[in-house]
Amino acid sequence: MTEQHPTVSIIIPHWNGIETLSECIDSLLKSTFESYEVIVADNASSDGSQAWIKESHPHIKLVENDRNYGYAGGCNRGADKASGEFLVFLNNDTIQKSDWLHYLVELMEKDNTIAAAQPKILNYYQKKMFDYAGGSGGYMDMFCFPYARGRLFLEQEEDQGQYNDAKKCFWASGTAIMVRKELFVEAGKFDEIFFAHMEEIDLCWRLQAMGHHVWVEPQSIVYHKNAVSLPMHTHRKYYLNHRNSLLMLLSNFSVPVAFYVGFIRIMLEFIAVGYAVIKLDWNHVTGILRSLIWILFHPVTILK
């Protein structure tokens, strides 16, 4: 780890979970790429995380936020303290192969049209399986439903080398995304309205609208636990996923396209509500309905 003029600034948004963060940092410190710094953006943890970082890892930059700003806000505040040419936003529930940074930096340095890139992301617990949150590069269908190589709906594929080609994609996963700092700032950073979920897709959309590209480099490998900070199947997770998907659609398309696609998407949301009712999944039902109410009452925010 380099203390002065690092090439890469690794920013870890964090909210509680010392054991999880400790494993992530221990893995980072084994990196064979040496020109990097680590910044932990702590979102007002209540478990003593700040004191633990100061005592156990005094060379790590600690950003002590006054409240929980979510992934988007935590990352933005961490980026403000970064010195590197490249920023890596990294989930705290990850471990990494020792050469992961080398491959990402090599990709970015050989092609300056690439604004952002992600590694191959595999499941922490089943290391031959792709992870749900990003797999080997993310894409978007015509109705703005995100999907990824290595994931079909809710099912993850086994990694058999079928997606080992470095290639252009639509979005890079916020689990581990490298972005050129200059372009991150120029694009307006993460939109903090998102709080958590899909803010990285929104960022990648804006970077591409600026004329840049997003890639996946599968030689770089990260393992992800998934849903540690915000568990699956909770009301809040459903709400943020549905709201942010609609917010992203309405914010990035032109008005005529947003109106057309948005109308179809809202119809699909109501179908999803009906399906959730049949399954008696009330967290899902209330999460979708709350997201639609938010969209209805925030037109100025969406069209800003």
Where do the PLM segments sit?
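Short beta-strand/loop segment that forms part of the nucleotide-sugar
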Residues: S35-A44, K61-N65
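Glycine-rich, basic loop-to-helix element that forms the pyrophosphate-binding segment
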Residues: N65-A82, N92, Y103
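Short aromatic/hydrophobic "clamp" motif used to bind/position activated sugar donors
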Residues: L87
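Conserved donor NDP-sugar-binding/catalytic core segment of glycosyltransferases
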Residues: T94-F145
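A recurrent flexible, glycine/aromatic-enriched loop bordering the glycosyltransferase active site
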Residues: G138, M142-A148, F153-E182, I201-L203, ...
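A short, conserved alpha-helix in the catalytic core of glycosyltransferases
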Residues: N164-I221
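Active-site-adjacent helix/loop segment of glycosyltransferases
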Residues: M210-L303
